[in-house]
Amino acid sequence: MKIIFMGSPEFSVSALSYLLENESHEVVAVYTKIPKPAGRRGRILTKTPVHIIAEQNNIEVNTPKSLKHDAEQEKILSLNPDVIVVVAYGLIIPQGVLSIPKYGCINIHPSLLPRWRGAAPIHYAILSGDDKTGVTIIQMNELLDEGDILLQRDIPIDEQDNIDTLSKKLAHLGSSMLIEVLDNIDNLVPIKQNNDDATYAHKIIDFHIDFNEAADVICRKVRALYPRAFLLFNGKRLRILKTSYYSDSSVQDLKPGAVIDSHMNIKCKDGVLVPLVVQMEGKNPCNIDDFILGYNVLNCSIA
């Protein structure tokens, strides 16, 4: 089967690698996000992980800013794909592209659709305390994550899973499912999603810890936003990379955000947050025991 692969971040690499290792299918081209300026004054262009893997395997790479133009759609048509596989590409796939391949466009989505449609499904599964999540492979249409389900499988969410570890698990699950779908595509019976059960995982832009939330909620936030959740420590950004929590009725009269002991345990709206691994801006990550050696945490400012 001739395949065009569309993907960009590290999550997409596993699926592309599975396809490249499978002799039954041929990746004729890769589409990925345009390289981003990086380094001083933006003089260095950083390619996506998918871009790098494709070049290493001598596959044609295309980085259009949009797929809406006729010229781009004609180029895809000329490649004569049997199917287009989309995994966290980052661009809208217009109807003109969806209708080109014999088998249309299929998408690997890391949630149990229709739960957690949208940009951040893995984050929201952790944030919401879901006990399981999974991968859904859908036949794409023009609506966001609303296509018919071709295959769906679930996995448990471990109490210690963060966005990094859970993403890797789902990437490998989705990759094996992709091969199964492609090998059996003529025999699959698509299942329509129930829109009444839909929930949405919008892009997350706020990574600041709010101690007016319960300690268990903050712990999930640290795992879901790893490694970006932070608080302000004496006015400087301190990333919180790993935590635990406990209940303590003796501190219930303290204000949320108060440091309650020399280990820098912090009062929350409900419960006490225990930072375990932290990272001060400009510094390397360290265990909390090493961090507090350099500070009088009982007299610090936490916000």
Swiss-Prot record:
Q: Please identify the protein, giving its name as recorded.
A: Methionyl-tRNA formyltransferase
Q: Which residues form the signal peptide?
A: none
Listed binding positions for (6S)-5,6,7,8-tetrahydrofolate are 111-114
The UniProt function text for this chain reads: Attaches a formyl group to the free amino group of methionyl-tRNA(fMet). The formyl group appears to play a dual role in the initiator identity of N-formylmethionyl-tRNA by promoting its recognition by IF2 and preventing the misappropriation of this tRNA by the elongation apparatus.
Q: Which terms are listed as keywords in the entry?
A: Protein biosynthesis, Transferase
Please give the catalytic activity noted in the UniProt record.
L-methionyl-tRNA(fMet) + (6R)-10-formyltetrahydrofolate = N-formyl-L-methionyl-tRNA(fMet) + (6S)-5,6,7,8-tetrahydrofolate + H(+)
The Gene Ontology terms for molecular function here are:
methionyl-tRNA formyltransferase activity
Q: What is its EC number?
A: 2.1.2.9
Question: Which NCBIfam families does the annotation name?
Answer: fmt
**Which gene underlies this protein?**
fmt
- HAMAP family referenced in this protein's UniProt entry, alphabetically: Formyl_trans
Family of this protein: Belongs to the Fmt family.
InterPro entries in the record: Fmt (IPR005794), Formyl_trans_C (IPR005793), Formyl_transf_N (IPR002376), Formyl_transf_N_sf (IPR036477), Formyl_transferase-like_C_sf (IPR011034), GART_AS (IPR001555), Met-tRNA-FMT_C (IPR044135), Met-tRNA-FMT_N (IPR041711)
Gene Ontology cellular-component annotations: cytosol
